[in-house]
Amino acid sequence: MSEVPHLVAVLGRGVVDADEPVVTADDLGLTRGDGCFDSARVVTSATGSARVVDLDDHLQRLGASARAMDITNPPLDAWHALVDEALATWSTPGEAVLKLLLTRGREWRSAGPTALVTITHRGPWLTPGDLGGAAAAPRTITAVTLSRGHPSDAFADAPWLLGGVKTLSYVVNTAATREARRRGADDVIFTTTDGYALDGPTSGLLLATDGALVSTPTGGTGILESLTVAAILEAARTDGVATRYELVPVTDLYTADGLWLVSSGRGPVLVTTLDGRALRTDQQLAATVARYAGF
């Protein structure tokens, strides 16, 4: 397997060798998952000029996660300077993912939080014709439903459960993805014990039904607000399309006019089968939703 282009930059140190150690053995982000992160899309032109899509929105969401966890967040200008330095060094054309990572820091020494940025190449451009590229990655997936193990209101009035917070503790998400692969599917749609759909391990949920675009609400469900879903719904409203957030029964997923898992890095990816059942896949509708998302 060829090496994937990857960059690491640490607050207070700048860009470092990607193989250089950047956290200590007692960093609470490593030992307890006590930290948060956010991810954004990076698009780099054929000449090596890189830009981050909606960086400020992702920094705001990171800040909200840090506040919910009582972690001191570096000033925005420090994050911007670190990202700018990373982008100035990054030159691999195509799509990449920027991660903003923040941990509580060392357990046995008062040294403040650990903050770093990574950029990892994902492949060719996802937007048709973008910067001379063409859509090369598959834009459809298969999925299975898996229970998240709690009801749809489990996070209401319980801020210590960290609902809606993008923590570093993603082990359940990765375990669910492995289970999907064991079942012959690409991805997962989490469900509640009272029969509603939530989101994916690394994505928001969007469906088209009765002429409207619908997504799962945050709050009591505990799901993370999807910035890309929000952008799609805003663009759809501007286009005269009805949108809403509401609890969606799992049974409604199988009869939807379209079903997508949505993330900032991949955009809206159309789900073609769910639990082995073929779904409706309107390509014109899928193209419209992709356009709403900027893909």
Where are these regions (language model features)?
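Ordered, amphipathic secondary-structure segments that act as subunit-interaction surfaces
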Residues: 92-102
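Short helix-capping segments at alpha-helix termini
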Residues: 91-92, 240
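Helix-start/capping segments and mature chain N-termini
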Residues: 1-72, 81-85, 103, 108-295
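Conserved acidic
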Residues: 75
